[in-house]
């Protein structure tokens, strides 16, 4: 029997049953109705949605209809900066950038250095803040412009957030956050208060613009508890409910459900060099057979293979991805060749990303929200 999985904003353990998790959280499945509505307004559908990486939501259809009525809205997501960024972290950001390109709305990006400081007993606050600046380079490298991307580093840009967070905190009882997040008597009060800050950004565009400006939040599904609470209290505070679009976790190279920062070989980082990327892909778990002869005779299993999973992420051509799938199943494609194909795709992506990342190094403060409000 499979180990019972655990998913919280701070821990993912076991093999995740995504349908069961969606039902536990009370989110809705992303259906063809919502996808068609997106296509109506965006003109196309991103591969991350077509291929099922994003699979659940809250009010995604409602915010698209809001857009159709010509009303203002914004995008919001974030990152807990505890180390370098890996490709799994970037999946919601890639969709975020695509949505920005299609709709041209403002983007709010929260770097939760305070949360990571509270959560990790070994983390120094200065270290978390340093990682916030480093991780911001990966966001900027995707091509956002300073007038539209508003970076919020919690310990540096708290001023516009705190009045909203105070109102949020007054609405949330200890019993509510304890039940939602699993807090215990040993949880420090920083972590207990922190949800107020993550929720506050969902209401920030409305405060800044002085009119209802709901947000759409593309993020991994482990973040749902925050935004479930945000939706529960929004109307009582005079704010529109945030909408969410939830992704699955990106399979680890080792075959587990989610990449792990504690195991560097489970993920490809945006700062990895080509030699490291090649080694990680060469050593990746696959759905292949023990020998080439068996693979040719029996075929492989791409459904459990992180290498195929990454092809789905990095190849925009549906026909190409389908060919890899069927070639693996039939035994025509061996794992070594498949890994080499993947290496070329990822090498190209990371090389371009690293170049853009370095160009952003002296520009972070120009994107910070507080520098625009001062």
Predicted regions: what they are:
Residues 86-89, 121-125:
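Short, solvent-exposed loop/turn segments at secondary-structure boundaries
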Residues 43-116, 217-221:
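N-terminal catalytic cores of NTP/NDP-binding nucleotidyl/phosphoryl-transfer enzymes
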Residues 86, 139, 222, 256, ...:
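Divalent metal-coordination and catalytic microenvironments
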């Amino acid at each position: 029997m499979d180990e019972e999985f655990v998913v919280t904003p701070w821990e993912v353990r076991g093999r995740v049953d995504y349908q069961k998790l969606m039902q536990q959280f009370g989110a809705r499945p992303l259906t063809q109705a919502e996808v068609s509505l997106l296509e109506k307004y965006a003109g196309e559908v991103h591969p991350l949605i077509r291929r099922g990486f994003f699979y659940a939501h809250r009010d995604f259809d409602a915010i698209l209809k809001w857009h159709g009525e010509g009303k203002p809205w914004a995008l919001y997501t974030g990152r807990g900066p505890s180390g370098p960024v890996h490709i799994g972290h970037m999946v919601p950001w890639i969709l975020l950038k695509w949505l920005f390109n299609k709709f041209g709305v403002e983007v709010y990006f929260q770097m939760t250095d305070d949360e990571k400081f509270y959560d990790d007993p070994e983390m120094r606050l200065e270290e978390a803040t340093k990682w916030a600046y480093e991780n911001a380079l990966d966001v900027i490298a995707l091509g956002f412009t300073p007038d539209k991307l508003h970076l919020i580093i919690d310990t540096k840009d708290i001023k516009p957030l705190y009045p909203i967070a105070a109102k949020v905190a007054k609405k949330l009882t200890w019993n509510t956050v304890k039940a939602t997040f699993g807090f215990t008597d040993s949880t420090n009060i920083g972590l207990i208060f922190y949800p107020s800050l993550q929720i506050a950004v969902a209401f920030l565009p409305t405060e800044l613009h002085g009119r209802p400006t709901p947000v759409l939040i593309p993020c991994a599904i482990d973040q749902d508890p925050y935004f479930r609470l945000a939706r529960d209290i929004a109307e009582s505070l005079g704010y529109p409910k945030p909408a969410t679009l939830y992704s699955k976790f990106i399979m680890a190279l080792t075959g587990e459900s989610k990449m792990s920062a504690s195991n560097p070989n489970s993920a490809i980082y945006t700062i990895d060099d080509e030699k490291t990327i090649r080694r990680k892909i060469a050593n990746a778990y696959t759905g292949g057979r023990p020998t080439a002869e068996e693979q040719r005779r029996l075929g492989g299993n791409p459904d459990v293979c992180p290498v195929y999973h990454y092809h789905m992420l990095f190849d925009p051509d549906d026909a190409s991805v389908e060919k890899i799938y069927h070639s693996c199943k039939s035994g025509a494609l061996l794992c070594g060749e498949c890994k080499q194909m993947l290496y070329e795709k990822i090498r190209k992506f990371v090389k371009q990303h690293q170049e853009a990342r370095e160009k952003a190094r002296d520009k972070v403060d120009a994107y910070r929200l507080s520098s625009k409000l001062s």
